[in-house]
Amino acid sequence: MLHFLVAVILLQIDSSRCGLPFYNGFYYDHDKGNGNGEIHFNGIRLVVETPGDPVFTYRGANVTLSCHYHYDPQLDVPRRTRIKWSKLREDSTSDQEVLVAAGLKHRSFGDFRGRTHLQQDSPGEVSLVIRDLRLHDHGKYRCEVIDGLEDESGIVDLELQGVVFPYQPLHGRYMLNFHEAEKTCREQDAVIASFEQLFKSWEEGLDWCNAGWLADGTVQYPITQPRKACGGPALSAGIRSYGERHKNLHRFDVFCFSSSLKGNVYYLAHPQKFTLEDAKQACQDDKAEIAKVGQLYSAWQFLKLDRCDAGWLADGSVRYPIVSPRAKCGPPEPGVRSFGFPKHGKYGVYCYKMN
């Protein structure tokens, strides 16, 4: 104990000679603490810089989310920092960890394992590289730089180019709670859409009068042509909102989001029509699989698939995609037409084959 007191006295005397607190790589100003034991940098600021505009890309692509940091004023001696990348959740719950790094060591988490690494091509660069982007990778990412007690961060918005489509399952309208809605979208090669994705689709002309779940737990629907059955003609066009709903108790439809494909959707030409089971087998015989709803929408959006032939899809629905509206092919607007879920009858089939 005596040795410890002597050491403290010597440190205090030594620091008083130079007029500054004890130096350990930074000058700390103990007088500017907030009373909670925190210590702030004195005259040195940690700055983290990320792009202000969203980064747009596609499913399956590789992307770099830019992040740089520096000190103001610049330091002569490099500091050891810890880097943390995380993904903000749509419903504002705790962030999802993506990657942490300290020095040359780094660790990725969950579904990001094996697909992420830090790009450090220049001083202060700690950009995140994500390979083989997946549908659920879209969203906001936080780049956090930690130096002792100092912690600064920036946000990067990653957006996938894609298509939003309303979905109502076989058993009818307003039958899905939130968790069932998420599962339903996944089964159709899609994810539950975000509000931003729905808003963008509304700007592009999506008009749908049935309310559906979104990723943040709210229930909303887009109207471009106000009318009596959809909030009334007196309301202006826009996104109608039911607000946040109970994820287990309340039931609605869902808005799903899908992006570009790694394969091709095609109509299987055949002189005879199929039952649903025959349609599935026909695709398998052609070394493919029956297409999912999200895949048909993606082919319509990205591959400009235009076919006036109704065909089975994997969920038991019958649909067809129209890029150039024409007589006897439905309404005068482009879109994916639906025959619902026929219990009887024979139709063609849309197949999906990987590249």
Predicted regions and their residues:
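N-terminal signal peptide
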Residues: 2-48, 163-165
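Extracellular/luminal immunoglobulin-like beta-sandwich modules
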Residues: 27, 32-35, 73-81, 144-162, ...
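Conserved Ig-like domain signature around the intradomain disulfide
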Residues: 63, 137-144, 252-253, 347
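Core motif of extracellular immunoglobulin-like domains
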Residues: 67, 85, 141-143, 185, ...
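N-terminal V-set
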Residues: 72-112, 196-198, 294
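Ligand-binding face of N-terminal immunoglobulin V-set domains in extracellular IgSF glycoproteins
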Residues: 113-156
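Extracellular disulfide-stabilized recognition modules
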Residues: 161-179, 209-212, 227-274, 309, ...
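Conserved hydrophobic ligand-interaction patch in extracellular adhesion modules
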Residues: 178-205, 267-271, 276-307
